[in-house]
Amino acid sequence: MLYEFLKNFPQRMKNVGLYAVLIQNSMQKTSWKQFGFAKFDEQMNLIFAVMLYIMEQSLKEENCTMDDIGAYIDTINSRYLHKEISYEDSRKLGDFIVNVILSNEGRAMYFDGYDFDQNDYHIMHISYVANRIVYLDQEVRRTSYYLTDDGYNLILSTLEIENNMKLTIHEMIFQMHLEKQSYDKAVDEIKNVFNLMRIQIGRAHV
């Protein structure tokens, strides 16, 4: 390979694709305006708030039906967002987010990442949520939603992975500077490692 830093490029682009496909799906939809979410920032905030709720329900091993999602949106709207929408609108909004934006109305989603080893694009499948049939009170049949591995990777990359990997990332950068013989930058990076260690030790003693 001509450039070693382009190794495993499709894997990098898969992570980029998780954001790109989601943004593309959302920006192309005009239905947001009927719910009062005209700004792109508002739309993305609500999408991720809904994904976090689905993740929370999954982690607690509790059902996550469209009624649950609608009630959740209605609650955060009443308390925080203050859009002029009813509970029924909140439920429709939840259905729109989960089944249209996150699920692409049942159509498969893909993102292409170029493989510089094979001189060709890799077509990578992307899926944020999945569902299963559950029975409430052993009789009522409902669809319950949960995050896929891609969904977890996307959500966790927004905060949890960064928080837990800060020290490791700085160690990786330090190693990369050494490999490139950028010794001055390596010294700066090891200082960052020590600073993070001091912060973590300080928190442990609080």
PLM features: residue spans?
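DNA-recognition alpha helix
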Residues: 65-82
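Eukaryotic basic, amphipathic alpha-helical target segments in cytosolic regions
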Residues: 58, 77-80, 105
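Positively charged, polyanion-binding regions of nucleic-acid-associated proteins
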Residues: 41-66, 95, 174, 178-203
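Extended alpha-helical scaffolds
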Residues: 129-205
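Short, glycine/acidic-rich hinge or "gate" loops at secondary-structure transitions
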Residues: 66, 84-91
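A structured, charge-rich N-terminal accessory region that forms the first stable segment of a protein
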Residues: 12-46, 52, 71
